């Protein structure tokens, strides 16, 4: 009887360790997958080497959105412009942030973006706030969504724990991410000029 108990305990421990090894990755909050915002199929194939060291924050400089429906439409508009007008393989950003407090999946954690030029695209994740932030500030829920996304990236192993945030204007001659948003990201603990 004792031998059977030992075998049973050993089998249960083995099963528990298998379950722990197969546990799902950490939850990443409100990331709207491409299919939910009705993205066009991506033709992009070039992968990022993970974990990535840099995050480049930009703004789309267009209309802002503050509901899931309007933000899904805005994500479609940005993607359509990038694909149809610029000839890119997909929306240029890895993620888009809406004023609704949701993150919209662009190219995601694994595919190289087209957001910051040939030097920075292969070594960074591009996060773009949907709207123009020259004279206005994104609402707190949008800023929280961005911060949560960055924590998610670290938890998933997509971003280094010592990642660096840069404004689009830090790596390219542009006004992006807008004066007001730029002031905010400069206060983030991972920001480096």
Swiss-Prot record:
CDD domains: PGRP (cd06583). GO terms for cellular component: extracellular region. Residues 1-21 form the signal peptide. The keyword S-adenosyl-L-methionine does not apply. This is Peptidoglycan recognition protein 1. InterPro entries: Amidase/PGRP_sf, Amidase_domain, Peptidoglycan_recognition, PGRP, PGRP_domain_met/bac. It holds the Pfam family Amidase_2. The keyword Secreted applies. It is found in: Secreted; Cytoplasmic granule. Residues 50-178 form the N-acetylmuramoyl-L-alanine amidase domain. GO terms for biological process: defense response to Gram-positive bacterium; detection of bacterium; innate immune response; negative regulation of cytokine production; peptidoglycan catabolic process. The gene is PGLYRP1. Disulfide bonds join 28-152, 44-89, 65-71. Transmembrane segments: none annotated. Innate immunity protein that plays several important functions in antimicrobial and antitumor defense systems. Acts as a pattern receptor that binds to murein peptidoglycans (PGN) of Gram-positive bacteria and thus provides bactericidal activity. Forms an equimolar complex with heat shock protein HSPA1A and induces programmed cell death through apoptosis and necroptosis in tumor cell lines by activating the TNFR1 receptor on the target cell membrane. In addition, acts in complex with the Ca(2+)-binding protein S100A4 as a chemoattractant able to induce lymphocyte movement. Coiled coil: none annotated. Belongs to the N-acetylmuramoyl-L-alanine amidase 2 family. GO terms for molecular function: N-acetylmuramoyl-L-alanine amidase activity; peptidoglycan binding; peptidoglycan immune receptor activity; zinc ion binding. Homotetramer.
């Amino acid at each position: 009887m004792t031998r059977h108990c030992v075998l049973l305990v050993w089998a249960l421990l083995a099963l528990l360790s298998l379950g722990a090894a197969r546990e799902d990755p950490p939850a990443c909050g409100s990331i709207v997958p491409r299919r939910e915002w009705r993205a066009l199929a991506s033709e992009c194939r070039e992968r990022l080497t993970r974990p990535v060291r840099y995050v480049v924050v930009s703004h789309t400089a267009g209309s802002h959105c503050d509901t899931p429906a309007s933000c899904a439409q805005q994500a479609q508009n940005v993607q359509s412009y990038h694909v149809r007008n610029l000839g890119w393989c997909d929306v240029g950003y890895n993620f888009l942030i809406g004023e609704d407090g949701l993150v919209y999946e662009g190219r995601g954690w694994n595919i190289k973006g087209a957001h910051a030029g040939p030097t920075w695209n292969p070594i960074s994740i591009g996060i773009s706030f949907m709207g123009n932030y020259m004279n206005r500030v994104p609402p707190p829920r949008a800023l929280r969504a961005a911060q949560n996304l960055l924590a998610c990236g670290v938890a998933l192993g997509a971003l280094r724990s010592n990642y660096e945030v840069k404004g689009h204007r830090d790596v390219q001659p542009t006004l992006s991410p807008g004066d007001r948003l730029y002031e905010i990201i400069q206060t983030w603990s991972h920001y480096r000029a």
